[in-house]
């Protein structure tokens, strides 16, 4: 069995994956982003200094780690170059540490324009996208009209292909959505400025990863968003446009499933969601406000305030099953400090009174769901910075045990603060 590890979110994103990946990359040779785009926001805090990454893998801060953007990612050249310059200004040699798949679809300004136009046209039925163009970029990939990084090697051919697709988008933008057209010449000029930088980092990622496996190098696969936002398994249509589950690791990176050994599911000690969509355990009271403010629940990408609620073990069980999760990492446990009681949703009561223990599929069936809670005592002691399980309050132990019982999966890692050091590792994911 391989000891390569997948790290992914089990909720609606924002679970704290970036910090966990950063910790575990101390053991890895490669960190791979395999899906999503710059709609992700992974926050790392190292010695009190905050770093927010959107496209670049969280392993970039490690000197001996190679960061990979694989072909399952839709790549915004503008966002990537901006991120590279910001990190290099801090002395991090990004271009020496990172490689990009030449099969990555390019995300350009016409995708953003279409995303924004569609959301505006939906009015009160807006999906709550980040407006970064992710959906339209994936649409182009599926429709086989996407421009890819590999197209940049032939600038003349790229310019012709770009003209065709800009005309296609502008027809819709102007005649259907009644908004301004995007400028073909500006898009072409902007991409030509950064073409040489992008192509200098290109590699055949599938071959690279297979060779790394043959050499015994350890790999970490970093997911973006969360399971409940998966295009197939999430709360459709309030989902992202990629597969966020473990199955996408192989299709999005080009490394076969036999070479994956352990799947670590990141779960926040409470639930959050950005944008519209079902959220059975959402809190609208002082407790919800407490979790939002204490947990600093504002999007790293959009700055939007996140909706907050109690931990939903029903949805978490679904994530465990879909991803064949080996172990859980419980994050932001310290945010619960000071609450008199803590609740976990263990089942749903449907509108007809029926009790179910797994999430529904159809959107209509989410309506009117009543969460059924298990209530536990809270704790007044601080858990911030605790690094040993024995030092946690007794009530925190009870909370962790109930999560394990409801999901039938062990909690292998506990995060007690934003810094690397604020972590309890009960089981090493690389030891399997």
From Swiss-Prot:
GO terms for molecular function: adenylosuccinate synthase activity; GTP binding; magnesium ion binding. Pathway: Purine metabolism; AMP biosynthesis via de novo pathway; AMP from IMP: step 1/2. CDD domains: AdSS. Gene3D superfamilies: Adenylosuccinate Synthetase, subunit A, domain 1, Adenylosuccinate Synthetase, subunit A, domain 2, Adenylosuccinate Synthetase, subunit A, domain 3. Substrate binds at residues 300-306. IMP binds at residues 14-17, 39-42, 130, 144, 225, 240, 304. Its EC number is 6.3.4.4. Mg(2+) binds at residues 14, 41. The keyword GTP-binding applies. Homodimer. This is Adenylosuccinate synthetase. The gene is purA.
């Amino acid at each position: 069995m391989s000891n390569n590890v997948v790290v992914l979110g089990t909720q609606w994103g924002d679970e704290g994956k970036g910090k966990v990946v950063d910790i575990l990359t101390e053991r890895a040779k490669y960190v791979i982003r395999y899906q999503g785009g710059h709609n992700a926001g992974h926050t790392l805090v190292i010695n009190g200094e905050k770093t927010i990454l959107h496209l670049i893998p969280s392993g970039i801060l490690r000197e001996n780690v190679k960061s990979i953007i694989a072909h399952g990612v839709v790549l915004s050249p503008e966002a990537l170059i901006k991120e590279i310059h910001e990190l290099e200004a801090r002395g991090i040699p990004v271009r020496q540490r990172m490689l990009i798949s030449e099969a990555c679809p390019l995300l350009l300004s016409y995708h953003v324009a279409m995303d924004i136009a569609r959301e505006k046209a939906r009015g009160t039925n807006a999906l709550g996208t980040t407006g970064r163009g992710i959906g339209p970029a994936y649409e182009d990939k599926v429709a086989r009209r996407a421009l890819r990084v590999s197209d940049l090697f032939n600038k003349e051919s790229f310019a012709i292909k770009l003209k065709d697709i800009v005309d296609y988008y502008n027809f819709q933008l102007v005649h259907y959505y009644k908004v301004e057209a995007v400028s073909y010449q500006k898009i072409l000029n902007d991409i030509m400025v950064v073409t040489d930088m992008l192509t200098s980092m290109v590699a055949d990622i599938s071959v690279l990863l297979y060779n790394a496996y043959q050499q015994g190098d350890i790999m970490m696969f970093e997911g973006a968003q969360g399971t409940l936002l998966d295009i197939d398994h999430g709360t459709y249509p309030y989902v992202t446009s990629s597969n966020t589950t473990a199955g996408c690791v192989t299709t999005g990176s080009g490394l076969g499933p036999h070479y994956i050994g352990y799947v670590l599911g990141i779960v926040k000690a409470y639930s959050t969601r950005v944008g519209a969509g079902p959220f059975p355990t959402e809190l609208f009271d002082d407790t919800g406000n407490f979790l939002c403010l204490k947990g600093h629940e504002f999007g790293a990408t959009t700055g939007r305030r996140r909706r907050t609620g109690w931990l939903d073990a029903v949805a978490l069980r679904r994530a465990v099953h879909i991803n064949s999760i080996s172990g859980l990492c419980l994050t932001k446990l310290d945010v619960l400090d000071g609450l008199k009681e803590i609740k976990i949703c263990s089942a749903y009561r449907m509108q007809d009174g029926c009790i179910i223990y797994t999430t529904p599929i159809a959107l209509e069936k989410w309506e009117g769901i009543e969460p059924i809670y298990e209530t536990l005592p809270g704790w007044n002691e601080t858990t911030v910075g605790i690094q040993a399980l024995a030092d946690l309050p007794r009530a925190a132990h009870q909370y962790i045990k109930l999560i394990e019982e409801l999901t039938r999966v062990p909690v292998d890692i506990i995060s007690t603060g934003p810094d690397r050091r604020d972590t309890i590792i009960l089981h090493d994911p690389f030891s399997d």
